[in-house]
């Protein structure tokens, strides 16, 4: 098996790269940081925790609206998803080798240029209100929510959406929190696997990943 290269970038991010011919002409990436929603803290709006990933899905990235970005990703055969879990934040994606420059640019923009999108937000607020109004009448959703609560030991942080939590959700505050979680490259490990030569990958890492903003401190998760 081929060796794994470990690169420590100037901004404190760590890159683990393994060349692999398992999937021809493709690169996969996972960026993982510690902390996640556990950093919301007891003083801030706890209801935001249930909607962080909805906020991510309905925000613009690098000037692309959510629908424009979906279209671009589809056209270029790129996958790209970001999320915030209870104890981590992550970005994962894959791209064909001929789209690597665009892919790394989109990864960079996902960290640095995420903004609210008014049209997407208003559609989301309308649809979510309808969904949550109907939720209590769905035996399947009630069952799913019950399982989630049990899994989280009835914690207040169990990601169960309801009209009550939605009424307390603050969109701007949640978006600011998401951006804060992705504002410290020093906190991230990038795991990259693909059918690509190191000579081709390294300049992209140096141009995009190494220039991500950093606070030069490592985060951890808060025990809730």
Predicted regions and their residues:
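N- or domain-start disorder-to-order transition segments that initiate the globular core
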Residues: 2-24
């Amino acid at each position: 098996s081929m060796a794994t290269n470990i690169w420590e970038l100037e901004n404190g991010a760590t890159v683990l790269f393994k060349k692999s011919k398992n999937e021809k002409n493709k690169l996969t990436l996972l960026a993982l940081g510690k902390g996640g929603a556990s950093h919301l803290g007891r003083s801030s709006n706890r209801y935001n925790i249930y909607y962080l990933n909805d906020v991510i899905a309905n925000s613009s990235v690098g000037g692309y609206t959510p629908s424009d970005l979906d279209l671009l990703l589809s056209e270029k055969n790129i996958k790209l998803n970001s999320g915030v879990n209870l104890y981590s934040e992550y970005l994962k994606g894959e791209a064909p080798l001929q789209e690597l420059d665009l892919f790394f640019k989109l990864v960079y923009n996902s960290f640095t240029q995420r903004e609210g999108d008014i049209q997407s937000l208003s559609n989301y607020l309308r649809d979510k209100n309808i969904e949550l109004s109907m939720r209590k009448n769905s035996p399947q959703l009630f069952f799913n929510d019950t399982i989630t609560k049990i899994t989280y030991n009835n914690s207040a942080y169990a990601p169960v959406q309801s009209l009550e939590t939605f009424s307390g959700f603050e969109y701007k505050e949640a978006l600011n929190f998401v951006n804060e979680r992705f504002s410290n490259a020093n906190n991230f490990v990038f795991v990259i696997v693909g059918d690509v030569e190191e000579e081709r990958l390294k300049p992209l890492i140096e141009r995009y990943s190494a220039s991500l903003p950093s606070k030069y401190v490592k985060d951890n998760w808060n025990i809730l």
